[in-house]
Structure formats: structure tokens, C-alpha cells
């Protein structure tokens, strides 16, 4: 008999929109659900829609002072120097007081944080912990339910790159990233994909709480390797843009020698790595200021144990 | 023998980038040409690349205080109340002092103003005056040179909608609008189209100055009819988004009864006009704040007389 993890039922779920104020699918859906909650209601579970960065939503910008999705580290969450805190750090502390505290037993069980990207990533789920069997099982369920539509999983576990995301205060933090969609735009096709992901996530939780056992599963994920910077000259000016052959090719293999950038005088700059990688977040608008042209990933397969709830209702 | 217009040679041409600071193709090209002018040089013509809204470019936003591309009316250009002027109105006066004055003999002959849109408009040329034979001839030349790639012409002459564009200070104002491209993003395909339009425009001017006669021509244009607003509830909240069937269908016919919007509860809102129209600027990010979901146009054909230069070099 295989190992089986017996887990507590899920009691509290939050759905975050507007962590980046110009990523409109989540803002629009969360505002809708705040008025019409029946779509996300599931028996015996508190499901709470919440706008995390109302200041940024109001201005339709990514953030007011700093990226809310990078400040949920212990230093910021504990900082009591109230006079000098940025809008987003104050907001992070407030969010942590409601849905956390991060790392504690009181934290929400699940946070689904809704994002858009200008990259052609399609429907994407973001996993923070490769040992989180519950979330891997959920992602497997969502992927299966979304088929034949592709639904990719990005694993952001990394020895050096730390994200300190808004959702990271939950026991099971889940990023939902759907693109391509320009900042400040609502596309019906993107909205529909995001909405279906949330439906399947909540259905999974409902089945789990009801006592359904989820058998051991495997999940193909793309694990973050590194960020690739734009070429710049001595003045710091960007000297090349994403090559046509790479544009819109998120999740497709990039081989050493493949075109990566194009300079304005027509010179191609090739990828010079020593192995095949799978780029993602290619040409994401918000990452120009971080000087990230794209993120490389490697494909790997995670295995999750069977899971079951302790106390079927 | 047909009529022929004999016109003065073109002496001064400006290429504007960054009128909207987050429309990056023009910003990137103009900054490139400021350092490497040989690509846009033509004998006997001053061709001046210029960043019109450096404050907005610096912040990668559409504008700092107000839309620079709507303030070139006589009231703003003459306003001397320096203390209370917005950044963009001050900038408009400065631009007018260099490239204008608007409506005077001293104004630049041609201004090519470079824009991007999140709409699927492809390569688009914007015409302000249906009687401007020189510009119609240029657009005909550009369209022919771009083929088989589509290059649409939008005519913004309208009894009620007035634009007061940045380029309107020139004798021949030319808008260049290429999409789809998200705000804050540079796409190689979009950059290439814009660059080819500028090459063909400058080649046309060069041929014209050299004494080449351009024979009478006809030009298919899409003339602005009206702007269509998003449906809103009593609180002013947007209640529907662009329908999937209309999204990305710029320049395609929209018939009475065709789907136009979709509400979050799945209801379709149909187009209820009384004739076929050709929508454009569908789901443009910058027009949410103007509450414009798209612009309707009608197809028409303009005729231009033959043109020739007075003094062939």
C-alpha cells in the first residue's frame, strides 16, 4: 500500500485580485464576486474575494510605491517604523494581519492570487513549494479539468531568487497567471480562462473536504532557472529587443544557438547556454524595469502522495 | 488633360516619438535615429527626430498631467498663464515654437508622429484632412510599398470629434499607429512595420522633391463615425467587456445584430446600429479612461489630383 497524507479540511480560502493594479482580469473578477458571491461559494468553506492593492487599482498602475508582490518577507512584515513605510509595505502588514500571520497556524489555508502577463503564457499556475502535495494534487486536478486547453505549472522554488509574494502568507499559496493581455486591458478569452481555473480550484477543495481521496499523481512543471537581462550599452540603454523567433514562444524549447535578441542594426544575438531551456515571461512589460527579458526554466516531473481529509463532513 | 497640383518642395520633416511615453516603438526608433541619423537622412531635406514628451517617456506612462496629443488647440497654444499650465500644455507650446507655429508658413512641412496601440490595427496611417492631396499621394505610395502587408488609413476628419494632435502643427500631419503592442513593451514585428512606413514616407518625399510626378490616385480610407462606450451601471462601473467575436477584429465589418459586448453573467450585447460599420481601436488600453470601447468607421474612397514639385532640384 502506498503512503497517503491525511490533511486537515480546508476552512478558509482567499481570492486576491489587484495585487498589481493594472492586471485587470483579477480586479474585474474579484469586484464581481464581492457583489455576486454565489459563483465562488462552496459548502462549509469561507471563500473571501479581496482587492489587495486598492491604491494601485485606483490609478491602474502596477504599484504605488513598490511591488506589493515582493514585500512579504519577515523584515517588511515586522517593520514598525510606520512613518517611513511605503504604501505597499503598510498594505502588506494589513493583509498579513487579516489572512496571516505568515507561517502561523492562523494563516488562511489557501490563497489564489490572480495575475495577468503580457507574455504568451496562456493559463499558468505558479507553485512555490515542490513538497506541497495538496497544491500539486490541486494543480493536477485543474490541468486535467482544463484539458484540452494547456495549463502550465511554473515552480518558483529557487536557491537564490526569492519572491516574498502576497499569497505566500497562506499555507498553500497559489499564483494564477494568465496571458497575453496588455496592462490596463480586459480580454474576454483571458478572463474566461482565469475564471475556469478558479472554478476548478474551488471544486477540488470541495471534493477534498467531502472526503474524496486523490491518488498519487505526477505533475510536469517548469522550474525557474534564471532571469535573462536585456543587452545594454555603457550608458545603460537597452540595445536589443526580443527576437521575432522567440517572441510569443513561452514554454517552447530554446536551444543553444537559437535567436534570442535583435539589435536595431539587424544583428541577431543567439542563446549561448549549454542546454535546452524553456523560456517564460518573455517580453513581460513589468519586467523592463527589472531588466528581465525572460526567465529560463527546466522541465521536471513532481510526484505527489495520495491525499485525504482527516474529517470528511 | 487632368488637373495637377504644383506644390513647393518639402524642406523640413520631423519624426516624433514618445508623444505617449509608454508607446515604445516610436521612443526606441527616435532615440536610435538621434544617434544614428543616416537611416532617415535624405538629400536636401532636414529630417529631425524628436522626443515630444520626455517626462512621460521617463516614467513610461502615457502622459504626466494630460494627453499631449489632444492639447494642440489655439486656446492651449496661446495660454500665457504659465503658473497653472500642465506639463503637457507647456510642452505643447515649446513644441509649437520649434515646429510651428501651427497654421503658419513657418510650420514644418511634414510631421510623422509615431504611436502604438493595444488594438489589432496592424500598420495604420492617420489622415487629418481629406483634401490634402500631398498626404493622400504619400499614403498611396506607402500602402503600395508595404503590400502585400495590409496598411490601413484612418481619416479622423469629423464634424464633432476634434483631436488637436501634436502633429497638427505641420502643414501635412501624419499619424503612424502600429499594433497590437502592449503599453511598455517593444515587439520586433511592430518595430519593423513602423520602421518600414518611415522609410517609404521619406522615400516618397525624396522622389517628390526630385521632380517625380505622382499621377491621380484613389485611396480607400476608414472615416471616423463615432466612439462606442462601455456599458456601465448606475454606479459608473463597467458591466461588460468586448465580446470574443469582436476582439482583434479591427477593420472587419460589424453588422447590426453582431456580438459587441459580454457581461460577466454571460449575456451578449449586440451591435444595434442601422448599417455596417468597420470598428477600430477595439479594446485600446488608453481609452478605458475615456470610456471608449471602440471607434466605428465607414469605408470611403478619396481621390487625389496629380502632384508635382515646383522646382525640381
From Swiss-Prot, chains A, B:
Molecular function as annotated in GO: aspartoacylase activity; hydrolase activity, acting on ester bonds; metal ion binding
Catalyzed reactions: an N-acyl-L-aspartate + H2O = a carboxylate + L-aspartate
SUPFAM superfamilies in the record: Zn-dependent exopeptidases (SSF53187)
Binding-site positions, substrate: 62, 69-70, 163-167, 177, 287
CC terms in the record's Gene Ontology section: cytoplasm; nucleus
Note on how the cofactor is bound: Binds 1 zinc ion per subunit.
Binding-site positions, Zn(2+): 20, 23, 115
EC number: 3.5.1.15
Subcellular location: Cytoplasm; Nucleus
Cofactors required: Zn(2+)
Domain of life: Eukaryota
Keywords attached to this entry: Cytoplasm, Hydrolase, Metal-binding, Nucleus, Zinc
HAMAP family: Aspartoacylase (MF_00704)
Family in the record: Belongs to the AspA/AstE family. Aspartoacylase subfamily.
Record's function text: Catalyzes the deacetylation of N-acetylaspartic acid (NAA) to produce acetate and L-aspartate.
Name of this chain's protein: Aspartoacylase
Organism: Xenopus tropicalis
